[in-house]
């Protein structure tokens, strides 16, 4: 789209699993430009499906690093062809799919610092990587390395207290350990290891960008309290790892000015600042403008909770990261697998496949459901690890079935009580100023949101998050420009469009759920102990 009056702006990038996307946001925080490149469609020569290669073992999942480089070439050329005015860009930042790692070959820094504006990036960087297909977040091939890492630091809980999460197969430290063990030659030829986020930032900087605290928290390597690499974790993964990673930086740091390559080839101003890139989940927290005490609930195929925490309590479930917009605070992520598909199943079975009847069932049943509680996990749940359907009546006796309308309320109340219990297990507390931001498919259903407001005893707002990682990256660019750690993020984004109020707690809700929540938690423990057998 051609530009008319010049608009000073910041760019927000997102290097996600299936595409690279960019938005331009002006000083009034309006998104006025967006563009994207879809890997499968626009770069078919790499042969990806959903942006990745799934290997024969079904566990190893990688993406070609040059595909990401070429996607950046294409998107910049598209912007140039559309008449985008690069001279107005004050700063840029971005997001990357979390946990993925890129291995720069010895000598790559030299190539990055001496890019010729006459050639595209991928023509100049094709020999710069010691691993051409990089492990990404969908990879689950590192179980052995996870066990080694946990053993090295005294167990899963000890690792979680140190790094914010127990060992997960997709987390970067375990992926690095696998590469060192299986491909020691490639590892020894690697001079720098980047996350997808810091790799993308390096392309814009024309030199290696540091890893930021927030995305660095998804590696099982960063001590989240001290914001330094854990020597015990580094040593358990691979030798000489600290020098290949370099020290991490606060997420709002200006890491440098844009490379002269972009000034000469595209017309960026030489003073355009690059603000540290971060992970896509932390960038989404920025895009949704979460503040202290807030919680975001994404109600999709799986349900995800984003929490803003002051005093985290790392556990064997969920993930705690350094907060991307306030380095003194934290954020947590909790994933629940049984989301919208479970809601659809119960709708189909209980209320004749109709969402309006589903809503009527919620309206016609009382808060607390007369003490009837249910757990609905048709696929093995992550939080907690339970499968199956479990229903309990007022006396806490297991029952085989509920009437249709009771079943609907038991499902929705149960899903939200589980979210509150597990959030509080990580140190989250509902505050008087707490807002809940709801996104995803079920956020269009007013009655579902009413139950959410009642269970958490907090107002629920709905927000459009189609580009939340991109928009959050542009907001973070403005934040870095304004002085980062010295200026509250909320001050920088106060002009952004406000979310819409969708539900407020019903009178008496807090008393009902204060009584039910401990009961629900006890029943969850009961099911867990029955499915696991007695503790060892």
From Swiss-Prot:
Keyword Disulfide bond part of the UniProt annotation: no
GO MF annotation terms: ATP binding; D-xylulokinase activity
Gene3D superfamilies in alphabetical order: 3.30.420.40
Catalytic activity: D-xylulose + ATP = D-xylulose 5-phosphate + ADP + H(+)
Keyword Repeat: no
Pfam (any one): FGGY_N
Record key words, sorted: ATP-binding, Carbohydrate metabolism, Kinase, Nucleotide-binding, Transferase, Xylose metabolism
GO biological process: carbohydrate metabolic process; D-glucuronate catabolic process to D-xylulose 5-phosphate; D-xylose metabolic process; generation of precursor metabolites and energy; xylulose catabolic process; xylulose metabolic process
GO CC list: cytosol
Domain of life: Eukaryota
Positions that bind ATP: 355, 441-442, 445
Residues that bind substrate: 99, 170, 280-281
Residue ranges that the Swiss-Prot or TrEMBL entry lists as coiled coil: none
EC number: 2.7.1.17
Role played: Phosphorylates D-xylulose to produce D-xylulose 5-phosphate, a molecule that may play an important role in the regulation of glucose metabolism and lipogenesis.
Description of how the protein assembles with itself and partners: Monomer.
Family stated for the protein in its record: Belongs to the FGGY kinase family.
Name the UniProt record assigns to this protein: Xylulose kinase
């Amino acid at each position: 789209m051609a530009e008319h009056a010049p608009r000073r702006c910041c760019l927000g990038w997102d290097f996600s699993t299936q595409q690279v996307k960019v938005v331009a946001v002006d000083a009034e925080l309006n998104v006025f430009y967006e563009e994207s490149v879809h890997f499968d469609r626009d770069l078919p020569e790499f042969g990806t499906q959903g942006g990745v290669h799934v290997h024969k073992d079904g566990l190893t999942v990688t993406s070609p690093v040059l595909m990401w480089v070429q996607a950046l070439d294409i998107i910049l050329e598209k912007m140039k062809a559309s008449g985008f005015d690069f001279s107005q860009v004050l700063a840029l930042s971005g997001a990357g799919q979390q946990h993925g790692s890129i291995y720069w070959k010895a000598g790559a820094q030299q190539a990055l610092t001496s890019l010729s504006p006459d050639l595209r990036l991928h023509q100049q960087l094709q020999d710069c990587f010691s691993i051409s297909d990089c492990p990404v977040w969908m990879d689950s091939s590192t179980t052995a390395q996870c066990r080694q890492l946990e053993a090295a630091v005294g167990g899963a809980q000890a690792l979680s207290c140190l790094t914010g999460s127990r060992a997960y197969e997709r987390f970067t430290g375990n992926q690095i350990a696998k590469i060192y063990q299986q491909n020691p030659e490639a590892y020894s030829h690697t001079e720098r290891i980047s996350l997808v986020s810091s790799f993308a930032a390096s392309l814009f900087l024309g030199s290696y960008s540091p890893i930021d605290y927030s995305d660095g928290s998804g590696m099982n390597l960063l001590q989240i309290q001290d914001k330094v690499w854990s020597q015990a974790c580094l040593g358990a993964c691979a030798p000489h790892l600290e020098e290949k990673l370099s020290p991490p930086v606060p997420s709002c740091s200006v890491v440098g000015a844009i490379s002269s390559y972009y000034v000469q080839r595209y017309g960026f101003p030489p003073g355009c600042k690059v603000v540290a890139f971060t992970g896509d989940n932390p960038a989404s927290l920025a895009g949704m403008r979460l503040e202290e005490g807030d919680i975001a609930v994404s109600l999709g195929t799986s349900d995800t909770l984003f929490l803003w925490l002051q005093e985290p309590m790392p556990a064997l479930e969920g993930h705690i990261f350094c907060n991307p917009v306030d380095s003194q605070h934290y954020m947590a992520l909790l994933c629940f697998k049984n989301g919208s598909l479970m809601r659809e199943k119960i709708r189909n079975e209980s209320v004749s496949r109709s969402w309006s009847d589903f809503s009527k069932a919620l309206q016609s049943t009382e808060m607390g459901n007369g003490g009837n509680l249910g757990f609905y996990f048709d696929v093995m749940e992550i939080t907690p690890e339970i499968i199956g359907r479990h229903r309990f009546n007022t006396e806490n006796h297991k029952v085989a079935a509920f009437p249709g309308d009771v079943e609907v309320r038991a499902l929705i109340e149960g899903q939200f009580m589980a979210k509150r219990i597990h959030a509080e297990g990580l140190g989250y507390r509902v505050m008087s100023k707490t807002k809940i931001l709801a996104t995803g498919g079920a956020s269009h259903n007013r009655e579902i949101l009413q139950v959410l407001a009642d269970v958490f005893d907090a107002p629920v707002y709905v927000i459009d998050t189609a580009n939340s990682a991109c928009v959050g990256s542009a907001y973070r660019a403005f934040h870095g420009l304004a002085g980062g750690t010295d200026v509250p993020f909320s001050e920088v984004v106060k002009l952004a469009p406000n979310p819409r109020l969708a539900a407020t707690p019903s009178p008496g809700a807090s008393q009902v759920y204060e009584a039910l929540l401990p009961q629900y938690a006890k029943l969850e423990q009961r099911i867990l102990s029955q499915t696991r057998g007695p503790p060892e």
